[in-house]
């Protein structure tokens, strides 16, 4: 039986980006292996996976702006924490961290959109991409199970503010509802900590679902996803697809589509959306094997 560690991995470090302090983990030496979380999580999501990669490179996990231990934006409001703003902060942090070449990306949720976008812009610097429950193509509402569809349609309506900013629905309901096991109070409190204060401190958890590329909106995110998708479906960049069973956002036609990507290895692990909380051992072992294979092929 898997033992689920509750302590964060590594020691938090901080860099100032555009006047805001951003938090990250940076452990070990060698070529970078970059773990990127999405909504509403933080680098804490990777705590039971990163240890599997020790000795295989420099392990980096960043907290997105307004999330984890990174600063909040001020003033805040409906126009803050868009995909573009999050990207600008994260890419500036990655630049400041000097990730070098031969980067391996490990991506989940919105971290996948950010990572796929960065990889598409830095194709010669990326050695391989591992991804799980990722944003691989624009979606339609028909792709969403009815029970979840209603909640996410709510986020994209005027009800989104009370749902997320007052009631903290994304952290209190969506997160635990997309994990097979029950998180301990200590684990939940790690995820709650950045969003303890009601109101605008919780804005990132609302801006993210409003940025999801669904039924053609928002147009700029749909265009971006189509741009990196067009590259991923033809590039021989090595890929590891960690398929979640039953999964949440890579299911049905989207799962069939992503299986068409070239030079891709696939494993299946138990999990809904936050698969790292259900299958860390399997995920960590698979990523370690993937990285060893990449390094071996490169003669490292």
From Swiss-Prot:
UniProt modified residues of type N-acetylthreonine: 2
Keyword Signal: no
Coiled coil: none
Top EC class of this enzyme: hydrolase
Limits of the AB hydrolase-1 domain: 32-155
MF term (GO), any: hydrolase activity
Catalytic reaction(s) noted: 1-haloalkane + H2O = a halide anion + a primary alcohol + H(+)
Keywords recorded for this protein, A-Z: Acetylation, Hydrolase
Domain of life: Bacteria
Gene3D superfamilies from the UniProt entry: alpha/beta hydrolase
InterPro entries cross-referenced by the UniProt entry: AB_hydrolase_1, AB_hydrolase_fold, Epox_hydrolase-like, Haloalkane_dehalogenase_2
Family per record: Belongs to the haloalkane dehalogenase family. Type 2 subfamily.
Record's subunit section: Monomer.
Classification via NCBIfam families: PRK03592.1
Protein name: Haloalkane dehalogenase 3
Source organism of the structure: Mycobacterium tuberculosis (strain ATCC 25618 / H37Rv)
């Amino acid at each position: 039986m898997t033992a689920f560690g509750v302590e964060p991995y590594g020691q938090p470090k901080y860099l100032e980006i555009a006047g805001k302090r951003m938090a990250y983990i940076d452990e070990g030496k060698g070529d970078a292996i970059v773990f990127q979380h999405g909504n509403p999580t933080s680098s804490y999501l990777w705590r039971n996976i990163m240890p599997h990669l020790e000795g295989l490179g420099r392990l980096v996990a960043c907290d997105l702006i307004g999330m984890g231990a990174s600063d909040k934006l001020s003033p805040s409001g409906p126009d803050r924490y868009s995909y573009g703003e999050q990207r600008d902060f994260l890419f500036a942090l990655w630049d400041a961290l000097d990730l070098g070449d031969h980067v391996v990306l490990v991506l989940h949720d919105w971290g996948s959109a950010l990572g796929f976008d960065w990889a598409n812009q830095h194709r010669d610097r990326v050695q391989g991409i591992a991804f799980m429950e990722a944003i691989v193509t624009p979606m339609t509402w028909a792709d969403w199970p009815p029970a979840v569809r209603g909640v996410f349609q709510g986020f994209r309506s005027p009800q989104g503010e009370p749902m997320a900013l007052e009631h903290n629905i994304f952290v209190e309901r969506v997160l635990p509802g997309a994990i097979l096991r029950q998180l301990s109070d200590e684990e939940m409190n790690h995820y709650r900590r950045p969003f303890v204060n009601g109101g605008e401190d919780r804005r990132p958890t609302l801006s993210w679902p409003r940025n999801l590329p669904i039924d053609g909106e928002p147009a700029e995110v749909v265009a971006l996803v189509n741009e990196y998708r067009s590259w991923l479906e033809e590039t021989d960049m090595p890929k590891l697809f960690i398929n979640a069973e039953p999964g949440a956002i890579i299911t049905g036609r989207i799962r069939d589509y992503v299986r068409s990507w070239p030079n891709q290895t696939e494993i299946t692990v138990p999990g809904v959306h936050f698969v790292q909380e259900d299958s860390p051992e399997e995920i960590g072992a698979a990523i370690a094997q993937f990285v060893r294979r990449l390094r071996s092929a490169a003669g490292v």
